[in-house]
Curated annotation (Swiss-Prot):
<keyword id="KW-0699">rRNA-binding</keyword>
<dbReference type="GO" id="GO:0006412">
    <property type="term" value="P:translation"/>
</dbReference>
<keyword id="KW-0687">Ribonucleoprotein</keyword>
<dbReference type="GO" id="GO:0003735">
    <property type="term" value="F:structural constituent of ribosome"/>
</dbReference>
<dbReference type="GO" id="GO:0019843">
    <property type="term" value="F:rRNA binding"/>
</dbReference>
<keyword id="KW-0689">Ribosomal protein</keyword>
<dbReference type="InterPro" id="IPR000630">
    <property type="entry name" value="Ribosomal_uS8"/>
</dbReference>
<keyword id="KW-0694">RNA-binding</keyword>
<comment type="function">
    <text>One of the primary rRNA binding proteins, it binds directly to 16S rRNA central domain where it helps coordinate assembly of the platform of the 30S subunit.</text>
</comment>
<dbReference type="InterPro" id="IPR035987">
    <property type="entry name" value="Ribosomal_uS8_sf"/>
</dbReference>
<dbReference type="InterPro" id="IPR047863">
    <property type="entry name" value="Ribosomal_uS8_CS"/>
</dbReference>
<comment type="subunit">
    <text>Part of the 30S ribosomal subunit. Contacts proteins S5 and S12.</text>
</comment>
<dbReference type="GO" id="GO:1990904">
    <property type="term" value="C:ribonucleoprotein complex"/>
</dbReference>
<dbReference type="GO" id="GO:0005840">
    <property type="term" value="C:ribosome"/>
</dbReference>
<protein>
    <recommendedName>
        <fullName>Small ribosomal subunit protein uS8</fullName>
    </recommendedName>
</protein>
<dbReference type="Pfam" id="PF00410">
    <property type="entry name" value="Ribosomal_S8"/>
</dbReference>
<comment type="similarity">
    <text>Belongs to the universal ribosomal protein uS8 family.</text>
</comment>
């Protein structure tokens, strides 16, 4: 049986990996997962992103900790296969009053809510990270 929501699976692997104090986690790779991971790395929530080529490409994410505690306090899926959530540029949410980020899939690629607001773009809210 195939996976119903691979993005939710990715976010859960990150959450579980940090709860278990893992150094790195791996999962099946896709373009969207790599784009989301790159946004999280740019924002400083994860250490690094690597795509391991093979018959089935694997995405390896190195997790980040600060003073022994996970940098990601919460990571929450918003738009899901059964209920897609789209917002216009002026409706984009501020996560934790601007302390967290919303990862948004726009027509110009995957970016943070801040970058989407600056570019004047709306899109699908993939997840909230704080």
């Amino acid at each position: 049986m195939s996976m119903q929501d691979p993005i939710a699976d990715m976010l859960t692997r990150i959450r579980n990996g940090q709860a278990a104090n893992k150094v790195a986690i791996s999962m099946p790779s896709s373009k969207l997962k790599v784009a989301i991971a790159n946004v999280l790395a740019e924002e400083g929530y994860i250490e690094s992103v690597k795509v391991l080529d093979g018959v089935k490409p694997e995405l390896e994410i190195t997790l980040k900790y600060f003073q022994g505690k996970p940098v990601v306090e919460s990571i929450q899926r918003v738009s899901r296969p059964g209920l897609r959530i789209y917002k216009r540029k002026d409706e984009l949410p501020k996560v934790m009053g601007g302390l967290g980020v919303a990862v948004v899939s726009t027509s110009k690629g995957v970016m943070t809510d801040r970058a989407a607001r600056q570019a004047g773009l709306g899109g699908e809210i993939i997840c909230y990270v704080a």
